[in-house]
Amino acid sequence: MKQPYNHGVLFYHEHSGLKDIHNGIGEVAKSLSSMCKHLSLQLSENKGDIIKYCKSIKNENYSSDVDVLFILGGDGTLNELVNGVMQYQLNLPIGVIPGGTFNDFTKTLQLHPNFKTASEQLLTSHAESYDVLKVNDLYVLNFVGLGLIVQNAENVQDGSKDIFGKFSYIRSTVKTLLNPVKFDFSLTVDGETKEGNTSMMLIANGPNIGGGQIPLTDLSPQDGRANTFVFNDQTLNILNDILKKRDSMNWNEITQGIDHISGKHITLSTNPSMKVDIDGEINLETPIEIQVLPKAIQLLTATEQNN
């Protein structure tokens, strides 16, 4: 088999979510070495390291022949690589291997949730261009959330998602829903302004959020548009019932309680100022400005999901 790439770099964290990271790296490397003449394994020890490595690749200090990047981790780790690639304008395809607590975007790429199977799928994958959301000075691949989404993330203690799995996350979500924090908002999408009061807002680029799929056939991370969802009180009551049953988010039951607005340019201010979750990382506060960057990044996409 001819290797399509010269030099690939696989980024990973020691605390990526895999029980045995070194054994996992070995399994992944078997597949990736079939794709690349040269494969470098690059440990990211601290937050921000991946962005620094992207700068080094851009300046050719890392190597002059890197032509593909791989990331082993969850949505937060992928977000760091996306920011490095966008910030330093690296026109390189990215192969994503699930290895964290949440791997929503790998579903969009039709990749299997098992890291070994997903790395094997990359052998027959192809590069496709996907939209990126620019949120103030940061870049987002999957979603922007505020209100209950941030509340819930802060209620889950560090590491508990790995130790107790889905149950701990759902228990925290129910606790959050019983004590929602409401806020006033002013939302402008492509020049049209909406004002109101809510306790949860979501701006989605990808169709998979929080382990569930948003049931909109026209929602695509390749259409040049972002989708804003404003949740009302009725929706939150249904969400609470669903989560108490420990089921996945059932969008079909709650869509009647959601305002949906699609557009290319979004500004959002709130009172009071609210923390903002971007792909699982709480890095911003309102006000925010969001611009859709059409087909700004290349991601390796499987032909079909391997179940």
Curated annotation (Swiss-Prot):
Binds 1 Mg(2+) ion per subunit. This ion appears to have a structural role and is required for catalytic activity. Residues 3-139 form the DAGKc domain. Keywords: ATP-binding, Kinase, Lipid biosynthesis, Lipid metabolism, Magnesium, Metal-binding, Nucleotide-binding, Phospholipid biosynthesis, Phospholipid metabolism, Transferase. ATP binds at residues 44, 74-80, 101. Pfam families: DAGK_cat (PF00781), YegS_C (PF19279). It is an enzyme of class 2 (transferase). The active site is at residue 281. InterPro entries: ATP-NAD_kinase_N (IPR017438), Diacylglycerol/lipid_kinase (IPR005218), Diacylglycerol_kinase_cat_dom (IPR001206), Lipid_Phosphate_FormReg (IPR050187), NAD/diacylglycerol_kinase_sf (IPR016064), YegS/DAGK_C (IPR045540). One of its GO terms (biological process) is phospholipid biosynthetic process. Gene3D superfamilies: 2.60.200.40, Probable inorganic polyphosphate/atp-NAD kinase, domain 1 (3.40.50.10330). Its cofactor is Mg(2+). Its EC number is 2.7.1.-. It comes from the Bacteria. One of its GO terms (cellular component) is plasma membrane. Mg(2+) binds at residues 220, 223, 225. GO terms for molecular function: ATP binding; ATP-dependent diacylglycerol kinase activity; metal ion binding. NCBIfam families: YegS/Rv2252/BmrU family lipid kinase. Belongs to the diacylglycerol/lipid kinase family. May catalyze the ATP-dependent phosphorylation of lipids other than diacylglycerol (DAG). This is Putative lipid kinase SE_0507. It comes from Staphylococcus epidermidis (strain ATCC 12228 / FDA PCI 1200).
